[in-house]
Amino acid sequence: MLGQLGFIATAVLGGGMALGGAITLGTVQAFLQYVNQIAEPVTEASYVITSLQAAIAGAERVFALLDEEEERPDAAGDASVITQGHVEFRHVRFGYTPERTLIHDLNLEVHPNEMVAIVGPTGGGKTPLVNLLMRFYELDGGSISIDGQDITALPRGELRRRIGMVLQDAWLFEGTIAENIAYGRRDATREEIVAAARAACCDHFSRTLPQGYDTPLSGETTGVSQGHMQLLTIARAMLTDPAILVLDEATSSVDTRTEVEIQKAMARLMEGKTSFVIAHRLSTIRSADLILVVRDGDIVERGTHRELMARNGFYASLYRSQFEAA
């Protein structure tokens, strides 16, 4: 930009002087060439400086990653002990950084087959609870056990295979419908895959595709709606039949009809399993055995929907505000 302005200024001033007879056109041409020759290295230098600044910023991120504490060595315990889904949090403390503790002295016991709903404002500490359960993060203090076994004594991979997840952003990979459903159980038969899809209300949808269950899905899952993607992930969880489920905002971005299908599929999925449901839409978790109201990393209220509404506290205000907004 600076070089272009210099070129224009030289051309205008030189042209005026040439018309007045002060200099010749050859002199003007020579000055224009000089301006180009001077501007080019200045422009290149600015590009180099910009590239260096980007490289320095990238290097800072790389070295910050290298300076991170290494993941603790994997344990050699037996995760097959996880059969009931009895979960206990004892004096759990956690923070993303040492300077800021997010969860303070959390104590919680979840019995087998119970549905636990976790609600609260955005950024209040709902998702970290299940992330800690699956050991995506390590505790700063306290312990978490499943069926009496401390999760730090179990291999991470084996632990996570025994916890089914249905997330808000349904994740499918490149492969067929059947391969996506069987992701957690590669040895599953076609009959088992179809049975899981039927229970998850996505059998009809799968059969109407051009190649049925053998229809390939691309990375962008063209032609598959968000609701159907979530139904496929529910079918995947049904096929693995885990003792514990984590359901994170699974109906927050679908239409009403699809939401009804997802709710039916989830009801079947949660039968006989310990379930942790993270939701902002409080109407979907009124039947939960236990509702945890989390704010700033602490459980400020706990109880059933009826108990919490009777207390007329933070949960009741959240619940009423949603229906007033609707």
Where do the model's predicted regions map?
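Transmembrane alpha-helix boundary and packing residues in multipass membrane permease domains
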Residues: 12-16, 60, 249
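A hydrophobic transmembrane-helix motif
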Residues: 1-29, 52
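Extended, low-aromatic, Leu/Ala- and acidic/polar-enriched alpha-helical coiled-coil segments
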Residues: 29-32, 123
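Conserved E/DxxT/N motif and adjacent residues on the DHp alpha2 helix
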Residues: 64, 71, 182
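An intracellular "coupling" helix at the cytosolic face of ABC transporter transmembrane type-1 domains
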Residues: 1-5, 51-54, 71, 93-98
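Conserved catalytic core of two-component sensor histidine kinases
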Residues: 32, 39, 160
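Cytosolic ends of transmembrane helices, especially the final helix of ABC transmembrane type-1 domains
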Residues: 7, 37-65
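ABC-type nucleotide-binding domain
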Residues: 74, 80-326
